[in-house]
C-alpha cells in the first residue's frame, strides 16, 4: 500500500492523471509500485526499512515553517536532544503524536533575517505548541522528516563532517556495540548537557542547550582525545 501511494504521488507529480491512458489506472499504479523495490530494504525477520542515506535537506520548508539546514548545520544541542527523544519514542512505539512532535521541534517559523537566523530559536517550553501547529503536515512528509533525521543520526555516529575546513568524525564520542541500532544507543544526552555546562565552555545548562550541536560534539571529542592521550601516557 505504501508503494502504491508513493507511486501515485510520483506519477501525479509527473503530470499523470487517471483516464489519460487506455490502460486501467490501477494497472499503471501497480506496475509503477513494482519498480520501487530499490527504495526499501527487507530483512529475514520481516522488518522493512526505507533505504534513505543522506543528510541533505530535501524539505527546507513546509508552508511558512522552516526545517533544519542540510547536514544539521544549524541544529542546537537542546533541539537535537528533544528531537532524538521523540524519534526514539516513535521508532519504538509508532505513536503518530510522537512523529508530529518530532516534526514540530524541527520545523519552526522563520527567524530574524537581520541576525542571520534561518529559523526562530528553539524553546523547550513550547513543545506542545510546536506540535499543535504542525499537525496538518501530510503523513508522507512527516515520514520524510523522520527518514532524514534518522539518517542524520546514523551519520553523526559513523560519518565524517567538514567543519572549518577540517574533517571531523564523532564516532569515538558515541560508545556503541556493533550489534546496537543507532536508536538503541545510550547517548546520555541529558547527562552530557550538565557535564559540559560544568566545564563552563558554553556557559550555563541553557547556554549549552542553545549552543550549536556540532560545536558541543567537538568539545566532547576533544575531551575524549585528551583522556585517551592521558591513558596511553599512564601505560608507558
Report each predicted region and the residues it spans.
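An amphipathic, hydrophobic-aromatic interaction surface with interspersed Lys/Arg
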Residues: 1-236
Amino acid at each position: 500500500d505504501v508503494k502504491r501511494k508513493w507511486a501515485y504521488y510520483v506519477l501525479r507529480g509527473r503530470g499523470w492523471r487517471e483516464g489519460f491512458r487506455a490502460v486501467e489506472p490501477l494497472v499503471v499504479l501497480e506496475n509503477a509500485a513494482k519498480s520501487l523495490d530499490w527504495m526499501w530494504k527487507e530483512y529475514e525477520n520481516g522488518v522493512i526499512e526505507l533505504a534513505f542515506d543522506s543528510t541533505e535537506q530535501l524539505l527546507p520548508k513546509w508552508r511558512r515553517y522552516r526545517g533544519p539546514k542540510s547536514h544539521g548545520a544549524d541544529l542546537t544541542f537542546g533541539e537535537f536532544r528533544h528531537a532524538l527523544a521523540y524519534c526514539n519514542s516513535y521508532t519504538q512505539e509508532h505513536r503518530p503524536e510522537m512523529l508530529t512532535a518530532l516534526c514540530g521541534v524541527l520545523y519552526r517559523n522563520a527567524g530574524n533575517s537581520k541576525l542571520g537566523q534561518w529559523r526562530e530559536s528553539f524553546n523547550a517550553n513550547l513543545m506542545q505548541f510546536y506540535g499543535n501547529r504542525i499537525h496538518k503536515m501530510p503523513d508522507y512528509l512527516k515520514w520524510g522528516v523522520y527518514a532524514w533525521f534518522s539518517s542524520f543520526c546514523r551519520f553523526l555516529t559513523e560519518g565524517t563532517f567538514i567543519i572549518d575546513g577540517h574533517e571531523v568524525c564523532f564516532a569515538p564520542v558515541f560508545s556503541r556495540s556493533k550489534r546496537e541500532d543507532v536508536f538503541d544507543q545510550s547517548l546520555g544526552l541529558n547527562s552530557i548537557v550538565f557535564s559540559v555546562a560544568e566545564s563552563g565552555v558554553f556557559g550555563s545548562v541553557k547556554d549549552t542547550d542553545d549552543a550549536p550541536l556540532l560545536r558541543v560534539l567537538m568539545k566532547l571529542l576533544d575531551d575524549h582525545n585528551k583522556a585517551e592521550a592521558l591513558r596511553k601516557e599512564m601505560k608507558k
